[in-house]
């Protein structure tokens, strides 16, 4: 049996694609990936051995387009969707798992049109446009925010290395793989104060910003463990006692799984303000500060007064393992029932 995983564009979608593919591979099931030439899909999976085959279509987003551009993009998606017939026929695809994002549209639409079971995973607290459109046609809709709730699929390494934080000794700034400019600028402003009070600083700034950030810290004579981007990010997260971060789905759940308390500064221009609502889900154990209110004085005060022990204990109790296993179990059970009909 071959299962197609589709979707991506950004790390939040692609992380779930990777984790679910790994779980399917453990069961001996064949998987193919259908993504886009745009976004980060090729960066993540072009050379990956996780999938039996990968396809990258020339799909692009529709949400922010208007007028004739929007109409043309919709026609392009329909054309790409029709083009999926050869891929599905070649691999005898029996089910499609969509992780959302614009690159999920062609394969997900083709699945619906041809009554191939569609399973959707939504990472955010505000449902993405494509997922919202296709939810009614899906065999199952998996979410950690909406009923019936499923545990979030998380890379096991974050759970295995989780520890209770008892005080703040090390502060980590997470700018993401692309580097969030606001987080980077905030880190630079806070670094002298943090260093003065004896805090160790870890700053993940994005590859494109690494040289510039290194020069700034060198000029200010501030000792910072600076990372552009690392596939071993969990090692740095494990060292942190408190993180200053955006609240994209994967980042939020990975920090929670490692029991790292966080000050979340949601990206204000995220679709549907979903980063804010993601963070609200962990409101009991984190601090949420709107970007317009996130000046260095306020953030420094939060760092100094954060009860990280209580938050860390709460996070460790909240996050459950085997999220991916439970979802794949459910998918397989649904497909077995489908075969009996």
UniProtKB/Swiss-Prot annotation:
Keywords: Cell cycle, Cell division, Cell inner membrane, Cell membrane, Cell shape, Cell wall biogenesis/degradation, Glycosyltransferase, Membrane, Peptidoglycan synthesis, Transferase
Membrane topology of the entry: Peripheral membrane protein
SUPFAM superfamilies with a match to the protein in the record: UDP-Glycosyltransferase/glycogen phosphorylase
Binding site for UDP-N-acetyl-alpha-D-glucosamine: 10-12, 124, 177, 275
Keyword check for Disulfide bond: no
Group of enzyme by EC: transferase
Pathway assignment: Cell wall biogenesis; peptidoglycan biosynthesis
InterPro entries in the record: GlcNAc_MurG, Glyco_trans_28_C, GlycoTrans_28_N
Pfam family, one: Glyco_tran_28_C
Gene3D superfamilies: Glycogen Phosphorylase B
GO molecular function, one term: undecaprenyldiphospho-muramoylpentapeptide beta-N-acetylglucosaminyltransferase activity
Protein name: UDP-N-acetylglucosamine--N-acetylmuramyl-(pentapeptide) pyrophosphoryl-undecaprenol N-acetylglucosamine transferase
Keyword Repeat: no
Gene: murG
Family matches, as HAMAP family: MurG
Family under the similarity heading: Belongs to the glycosyltransferase 28 family. MurG subfamily.
UniProt GO BP: carbohydrate metabolic process; cell division; cell wall organization; lipid glycosylation; peptidoglycan biosynthetic process; regulation of cell shape
PANTHER family cross-referenced by the UniProt entry: GLYCOSYLTRANSFERASE, UDP-N-ACETYLGLUCOSAMINE--N-ACETYLMURAMYL-(PENTAPEPTIDE) PYROPHOSPHORYL-UNDECAPRENOL N-ACETYLGLUCOSAMINE TRANSFERASE 1
Location(s) in or outside the cell: Cell inner membrane
Major subcellular location class: membrane
A Gene Ontology cellular-component term: plasma membrane
UniProt catalytic activity: di-trans,octa-cis-undecaprenyl diphospho-N-acetyl-alpha-D-muramoyl-L-alanyl-D-glutamyl-meso-2,6-diaminopimeloyl-D-alanyl-D-alanine + UDP-N-acetyl-alpha-D-glucosamine = di-trans,octa-cis-undecaprenyl diphospho-[N-acetyl-alpha-D-glucosaminyl-(1->4)]-N-acetyl-alpha-D-muramoyl-L-alanyl-D-glutamyl-meso-2,6-diaminopimeloyl-D-alanyl-D-alanine + UDP + H(+)
Enzyme Commission code(s) on record: 2.4.1.227
Role: Cell wall formation. Catalyzes the transfer of a GlcNAc subunit on undecaprenyl-pyrophosphoryl-MurNAc-pentapeptide (lipid intermediate I) to form undecaprenyl-pyrophosphoryl-MurNAc-(pentapeptide)GlcNAc (lipid intermediate II).
